[in-house]
From Swiss-Prot:
Transmembrane segments: none annotated. Residues 289-329 form the UBA domain. It comes from Mus musculus. ATP binds at L30, G31, Q32, G33, T34, F35, G36, E37, V38, K53. The active site is at D142. GO terms for molecular function: ATP binding; protein serine kinase activity; protein serine/threonine kinase activity. It comes from the Eukaryota. May play a role in sperm motility, especially in the regulation of flagellar function. Residues 359-399, 464-509, 531-576, 617-640 are annotated as: Disordered. CDD domains: STKc_AMPK-like (cd14003), UBA_MARK_Par1 (cd14337). Belongs to the protein kinase superfamily. CAMK Ser/Thr protein kinase family. Smok subfamily. This is Sperm motility kinase X. Residues 24-271 form the Protein kinase domain.
Length: 640
């Protein structure tokens, strides 16, 4: 008889194992409990790790079926998900979601206690999970760190609803159940209690234990612990924030009627900083709206779409539904682990494309074309570092700064950006330049192309101090800078155009090196031209506005044709004077030298010393008589 029974048990165990191993591969044992054991297994189709709770069918496990029904009705990100149920003659295999992070108790024992920030995060997730259960009329009745698991991201997963039950509004429970240190005071009274209030008390004990690493009600005997719980006295010698102590005090209120509900807890000040709403379920509305991508994938595996919908609609929790839920879970993990763009970087990229008034160091690309030509207002402060001189530049409103009216379009001036300042005149050496251009005494005038002098908004113009510019000059002639007076009285959507014919500068090259640094960019060139030759600053009268004095940057004229791209990224060279002008200058200099040798004996009344070593003829009249005199290079001749 005993031998026959042993054979029957062997056949039964073989059948039981086959029902399980047909879909899962057992890996190891996770734990052993009073009612059964938990195995770690791998799903053969999706290779998903799962936890399988093996519960033998017996009178002791009369609560297995209520737990299964509760798990079937729960679908929340912070609650362990039921995946598959295998019911055999001897055992019930409950396939659950596997939380790789282990128990919360192990985490607390490892670190002693948790930081308040971590307590805040985990406690909020617990509140959301418990709020979801209470809304469905389910009470846990065994909240403790051993029944709180952590997933691969460290998030809470509430598990073990073996002592849980479903209640209706106003229903009282009479069964004493739970773990003693986490039991509420009303459980020790001989009357009914509210299951929701007991869960809130246990939640307060868990929060206290996370923040301190100690149980609030502890003792060496059952009676000692019971008396402390009924009295509601617990140590407050730990260094916690006042807000956290306030939450603990409200949760551990002895009177269950004065104890807050989970909805009240969610509105506590300690839980409100991040304004995070309760997370949605991962499997919400899967019965009526299955994921199309998962349906296609399961179709490739050989599953019938109609069978999939039927299994989800009726919540069979069979092999078909288990495969769908595992694929859904993997899809959710992939979406969370996918790297997304950083909002702060995008914000910096967006801000980098917008105009700003802050001084920043930036690089102008060769492909970026300035929309408006602008003046530059450099700061007076300059720094010298490692042979480099840097100047900070500010941007002025877009104004027209061209010398050729025919080739340069007009630019409208925005009234909001115009800084009203009137620069009446500029002093350059001893020569005064008025608002209208004047020709020099030699009658020489140069044709200048349209130059757009502008600065990089929010950037620094950097020029090297040295002989780089002098080497790049070659045979080019020294050309004076062109200064214009800016009048911005008409700012309301008007176009300003001015034709400027600059005079020839009498300043020597030695004096020209004493000016400020500047940046010159032409209409066709996109690169920054770092130059060493500079111009003296403007002096202004009756200035309207604030800021440093306007300092015009020196420019070197070039042919208009070359401005369209032939000199892209290169320095401009100054064209030589016309051939007839050079011949006339040579003849004139020879004539002056001949007259000087012939008339050396005449009395000298005044000599002229040009500052720029150029041959200039100055006409003057005599102070004492009616006859004028003509002076050539310090030699006075009688006027005819």
């Amino acid at each position: 008889m005993k031998r026959w029974q042993a054979c029957q048990d062997l056949r039964s165990n073989t059948f039981e194992d086959a029902a399980l191993t047909e879909h899962y591969e057992i890996l190891t044992t996770l734990g052993q409990g009073t009612f059964g054991e938990v195995k770690l297994a791998s799903h053969l189709v999706t290779q998903t790790k799962v936890a399988i709770k093996i519960l033998p069918k017996s009178r002791k496990n009369s609560l297995v079926q209520p737990e299964i029904e509760i798990m079937k009705s729960l679908d929340h990100p912070h609650i362990i998900k039921l995946l598959h149920i295998i019911d055999t003659t001897r055992n019930i295999f409950i396939v659950l979601e596997h939380a790789v992070g282990g128990e919360l108790m192990s985490r607390i024992e490892e670190f002693g206690y948790l930081a308040e920030v971590e307590c805040h995060r985990l406690f909020k997730q617990l509140v959301y999970a418990l709020q979801y259960c209470h809304e469905k009329g389910i009470v846990h009745r065994d909240l403790k760190p051993e029944n709180i698991l952590l997933d691969h991201r460290g998030n809470v997963k509430l598990t073990d609803f073996g002592l849980g039950t479903k209640i209706i509004m106003g229903q009282k429970l009479v069964t004493f159940c739970g773990t003693l240190p986490y039991c509420a005071p009303e459980l020790f009274e001989d009357r009914g209690y509210d299951g929701r209030a007991t869960d809130v008390w246990s939640l307060g004990v868990v929060l206290y234990f996370m923040a301190t690493g100690c149980l609030p009600f502890n003792g060496y005997s059952y009676e000692a612990i019971k008396q402390k719980i009924i009295a509601g006295k617990y140590p407050r010698s730990f260094s916690l924030s006042p807000e956290l102590w306030e939450v603990i005090a409200k949760l551990l209120t002895v009177n269950p009627g004065e104890r807050p509900t989970v909805h009240d807890i969610a509105r506590f000040k300690w839980l409100k900083p991040d304004n995070e709403a309760s997370p949605a379920s991962l499997g919400e509305n899967i019965e009526s709206h299955p994921d199309p991508s998962i349906m296609v994938l399961m179709g490739v595996m050989g599953y019938n779409p109609g069978e999939i919908r039927e299994s989800l609609r009726e919540k069979k929790f069979d092999q078909v539904m288990a495969t769908y839920l595992m694929l859904k879970q993997q899809s959710a993990w992939e979406n969370k682990t996918t790297k997304k763009p950083d909002p702060r970087l995008c914000d910096r990229m967006l801000r980098s494309t917008e105009p700003t008034i802050k001084n920043q160091t930036s690089v102008r690309r060769a492909s970026s074309v300035p929309t408006h030509s602008t003046f530059s207002l450099p700061n007076e402060s300059e720094s010298l570092e490692k042979g480099k001189r840097t100047t900070m530049s500010h941007s002025m409103p877009p104004t027209r700064n061209c010398f050729n009216e025919e080739t340069t379009p007009l630019h409208s001036i925005c009234p909001q950006l115009v800084q009203k300042a009137h620069y009446r005149r500029s002093i350059w050496g001893e020569t005064e330049i008025s608002d209208t251009s004047e020709e020099s005494s030699t009658g020489e005038s140069l044709e200048h192309p349209s130059l757009k002098i502008h600065t990089l908004q929010t950037s620094m113009g950097v020029s090297k101090a040295g002989s780089t510019y002098s080497k790049s000059k070659g045979s080019s002639q020294c050309v004076s800078s062109h200064h214009t007076s800016v009048e911005e009285d008409q700012c309301e959507g008007t176009n300003i155009s001015r034709e400027i014919n600059p005079p020839l500068s009498p300043v020597s090259p030695q004096e020209n090196l004493m000016g400020q640094l500047h940046i010159v960019t032409t209409a066709g060139s996109m690169d920054i031209m770092n130059t060493q030759v500079t111009s003296p600053p403007f002096s202004r009268k009756e200035a309207k506005g604030e800021g440093p004095a306007l300092q015009q940057r020196e420019s070197r004229p070039s042919s208009p044709n070359t401005l369209q791209g032939h000199l892209h990224g290169r320095r401009q060279t100054v064209p030589q004077a016309p051939f007839q002008r050079r011949v006339w200058r040579t003849l004139r200099n020879g004539l002056i030298r001949g007259l000087r040798t012939l008339c050396c004996c005449l009395p000298i009344e005044r000599r002229v010393h040009p500052t720029n070593n150029r041959d200039l003829a100055v006409s003057q009249k005599s102070h004492g008589g009616s006859h004028g005199i003509r002076a050539f290079r310090g030699t006075v001749l009688p006027e005819k």
